[in-house]
Swiss-Prot record:
Protein name in the entry: Single-stranded DNA-binding protein 1
Subunit structure: Homotetramer.
Domain of life: Bacteria
GO biological process, one term: DNA replication
Gene Ontology cellular component terms for the protein in this record: nucleoid
Native source organism of the sequence: Staphylococcus aureus (strain Mu50 / ATCC 700699)
Keywords assigned by UniProt, alphabetized: DNA damage, DNA recombination, DNA repair, DNA replication, DNA-binding
PROSITE patterns in alphabetical order: SSB
Amino acid sequence: MLNRTILVGRLTRDPELRTTQSGVNVASFTLAVNRTFTNAQGEREADFINIIVFKKQAENVNKYLSKGSLAGVDGRLQTRNYENKEGQRVYVTEVIADSIQFLEPKNSNDTQQDLYQQQVQQTRGQSQYSNNKPVKDNPFANANGPIELNDDDLPF
């Protein structure tokens, strides 16, 4: 028997993190997954699938994913049931995730800004050890006319 589910979609809400009585972290969220075909109006419909994830991965999901985040989920399909306050039997189908892939950075603007700041700091650090000479952006900025190069001057 095989019970394997692989999904890629966007979160419809922020993950909800809770802890069981035995101390296990559990996160839940809903993933919107587009169908591969279009309806009569030419629009793609989506399925909204409940996802449950446990332990350390639940903490990571809560920390790094939010509404609108693109995520990949690998897990198994599970149906559970319970009796509601009115005495009716309620069935819930959800995916129990074995693995969650974060398919985009939490905030790409922050990440790009951090990388830029690191590069600036590295450049400043290098200039301290090169006789404090400023690095010119364009070494040919003061050239008056064409620059002559021979094939022997090229490193390739």
